[in-house]
Amino acid sequence: IYSLGKELYADVPGGLKKIKQMGYTNLELAGYKEGKIGGVDMMEFKKMVDDAGLKITSSHVNPPVREYTKANRSQISEYWKKTADDHAKLGVKYLIQPGQPSTRSTEETAFVCEIFNEAGKIVKAAGIPFGYHNHEMEFAKVNPGSTEAKLGRRVKGDCIYELFLKNTDPSLVFFEMDVYWAVMGQQDPIEWLKKYPNRIKVLHIKDRAILGESGMMNFENIFRQAYANGIKDYFVELEGMPDGRSQ
């Protein structure tokens, strides 16, 4: 529902019914904060979703800090405990972090992986799998002691996304690949799906604006590989709509 922005909250029941009429069946939430979704009580929001004949499958949530440190480690853990408990009441299938923490060096990235594993344990204890959603800068590269992640095929170093995959526990952390942002990170989503078939379990299907208009997204082959991997869940997202066009 991130795609719908303020348009949805102008008339939540009506907006949800329109989503159902379009043929969608499942929702991925966004806008969670202190027991509310976009300012609406979570259970009240769930009732409106149920009444529209839809199901809440996933939710995007971010801890209140972007830079992870030993000093705020416990704060992050407490956030996940509260967030997981709240979402367990909704019966979500996935709880996913869409915001990239600060990862400017190999060491900083390794610490983020530790925190991801801790979050995974907490969320798993509530009966929900914990996942991570990428943008383009996860495909940047870092080095030991570096102070900046750099994007580019000729840049030397370790790919942050690869480090995330290699240094998180598969039983605690899965990945939701945003195929558009992977392409913007100069990557082929299909190659990642082939390399990590058991780690990438959900997809974000997205284009520069309207799906299929840019000509840059190889959706047919992406879906072919995703289905071969056994991926069952994906979410359509729209961003950057031209003026005069509704989300």
Predicted segments — roles?
Residues 1-3, 8-23, 91, 158-177, ...:
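Histidine-acidic metal/acid-base catalytic patches
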Residues 1-93:
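N-terminal pre-domain/capping segments
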Residues 37-59, 107-108, 112, 116-119, ...:
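Short acidic, glycine/proline-enriched helix-loop-strand junctions
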Residues 4-10, 29-41, 63-77, 101-110, ...:
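Acidic-and-aromatic substrate-binding clefts and catalytic sites of carbohydrate-active enzymes
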Residues 26, 69-174:
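Active-site acidic/histidine proton-transfer and metal-coordination neighborhood
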Residues 41-50, 83-88, 117-121, 188-195, ...:
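Short amphipathic alpha-helices and their capping/turn segments at secondary-structure boundaries
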